UniProtKB/Swiss-Prot annotation:
It comes from Arabidopsis thaliana. Its main location: nucleus. The lineage of its organism: Eukaryota, Viridiplantae, Streptophyta, Embryophyta, Tracheophyta. This is Transcription factor BPE. Coiled coil: none annotated. One of its GO terms (biological process) is regulation of DNA-templated transcription. Keywords: Developmental protein, DNA-binding, Nucleus, Transcription, Transcription regulation. Involved in the control of petal size, by interfering with postmitotic cell expansion to limit final petal cell size. InterPro entries: bHLH_dom, bHLH_ZIP_TF, HLH_DNA-bd_sf.
C-alpha cells in the first residue's frame, strides 16, 4: 500500500492531526513528555512544512522517511545499549569470577591452615604422655600437681630442720633470713670444733705427765726402746762389776778434767786410767759410740783421738748414754704429741 495513495484517496486532513510532534520548533505544554523521546531535529529536518513546500505527497514521503529513520535509529541505539550492557556484563562477570577465585583461594588457604593446625595439635597430643590425673585449677593456698605437692613437703621439712637448728644455736632466733641463720650456725660449729681440739690437746698433755711409760708410744717405736733398755741394763751391770773389781787394792789415777762444749758437761767429772787391753776396748767402743751418736742425730760426738789424748773410761760413756736415752725419750714423746695434734 502506498501511503501517498492512501493519503490522496482520503478526505481532507490536517498535518497536525497526523504528526503529533511539534512543528516549526514550537511546543505546547502537553508536548514536554514527548520531547524526551523525539526531540527537535530528530529526523534531520527542522521543519517539514518547509521541506514539502505545501505539497502533501512530499510531506507524506518525508514523514515516512523520518519515521523509518527514527525506527532505524532506535534499533541502533538498542543494539548499542545491548552491546554496552553485554560489555558491562562481561566485565562484571570477569570481576565476579576474579573475586570468586580470590575468595576460593582464601577459603582454601584457611582450610589448609586449619588442617595443618589440627595435624600439629594431634601430633602434640600424641607426643605428650598421658597424665594419670585430671588437671584442676587449684585454689589459693592449695595445690593439685604431684610435683608441687612434693616440693611443698620438701620445703616444710627444711623449715622444720631450720627451726631445730635455731633452737640449738644460742642467739640464732634473733636473726632473720635463711642465709644469715646458716652463717650463724656455721660459725657456732667452727667455734665448737676449735674448743674440742684445744681440750683434746690439753688432755693429751695431762695424760703424758701422769703416765710417761712405754704404753704411751706407738708400737713401731716400742721395740727400739726395749732394745735400748736391754743394752743399757747389760752395760750398766758390766760397768759396775768392772769398777768394783778394779778398785780393790789399787789407786785410781785422776787426770785433768776436760770439759766439752758440745756436751755441756760439768767440770767435776773424773777419768780413770786402765790397762792396755781396757784401753783397746774403750777406743773401739768410742768409735762405735761416735757412729751411734751421729746416726741418732745427738749433739754428742765422742772420739778419743780428736777430743782428748787419754783413754776414756766407761764412766764417761755411761753418762753419755744416759743423756742419749733421755734425749730419745723426749724426742719420741714430742713426735707422738705432734702426730696426735695434727691428725
Amino acid at each position: 500500500m502506498d501511503p501517498s495513495g492512501m493519503m490522496n484517496e482520503g478526505g481532507p486532513f490536517n498535518l497536525a492531526e497526523i504528526w503529533q510532534f511539534p512543528l516549526n520548533g514550537v511546543s505546547t505544554a502537553g508536548d514536554s513528555s514527548r520531547r524526551s523521546f523525539v526531540g527537535p531535529n530528530q529526523f534531520g529536518d527542522a521543519d517539514l512544512t518547509t521541506a514539502a513546500n505545501g505539497d502533501p505527497a512530499r510531506m507524506s514521503h518525508a514523514l515516512s522517511q523520518a519515521v523509518i529513520e527514527g525506527i532505524s535509529g532506535a534499533w541502533k541505539r538498542r543494539e548499542d545499549e545491548s552491546k554496552s550492557a553485554k560489555i558491562v556484563s562481561t566485565i562484571g562477570a570477569s570481576e565476579g569470577e576474579n573475586k570468586r577465585q580470590k575468595i576460593d583461594e582464601v577459603c582454601d588457604g584457611k582450610a589448609e591452615a586449619e588442617s595443618l593446625g589440627t595435624e600439629t595439635e594431634q601430633k602434640k597430643q600424641q607426643m605428650e604422655p598421658t597424665k594419670d590425673y585430671i588437671h584442676v585449677r587449684a585454689r589459693r593456698g592449695q595445690a593439685t600437681d604431684s610435683h608441687s605437692l612434693a616440693e611443698r613437703a620438701r620445703r616444710e621439712k627444711i623449715s622444720e630442720r631450720m627451726k631445730i637448728l635455731q633452737d640449738l644455736v644460742p642467739g640464732c632466733n634473733k636473726v632473720i633470713g635463711k642465709a644469715l641463720v646458716l652463717d650463724e650456725i656455721i660459725n657456732y660449729i667452727q667455734s665448737l670444733q676449735r674448743q674440742v681440739e684445744f681440750l683434746s690437746m690439753k688432755l693429751e698433755a695431762v695424760n703424758s705427765r701422769m703416765n710417761p711409760g712405754i704404753e704411751v708410744f706407738p708400737p713401731k717405736e716400742v721395740m727400739i726402746l726395749m732394745i735400748i733398755n736391754s743394752i743399757f741394763s747389760i752395760f750398766f751391770t758390766k760397768q759396775y762389776m768392772f769398777l768394783s773389781r778394779y778398785s780393790r787394792g789399787r789407786s785410781l789415777d785422776v787426770y785433768a778434767v776436760r770439759s766439752f762444749k758440745h756436751c755441756n758437761k760439768r767440770s767435776d767429772l773424773c777419768f780413770c786410767s786402765c790397762s792396755p787391753k781396757t784401753e783397746l776396748k774403750t777406743t773401739i767402743f768410742s768409735q762405735n759410740m761416735t757412729c751411734f751418736c751421729r746416726y741418732s742425730r745427738v749433739g754428742v760426738a765422742i772420739s778419743s783421738s780428736k777430743h782428748c789424748n787419754e783413754p776414756v773410761t766407761l764412766c764417761f760413756y755411761s753418762y753419755c748414754l744416759r743423756k742419749i736415752y733421755h734425749f730419745l725419750l723426749w724426742n719420741l714423746k714430742y713426735k707422738i704429741q705432734k702426730s696426735v695434734l695434727f691428725s
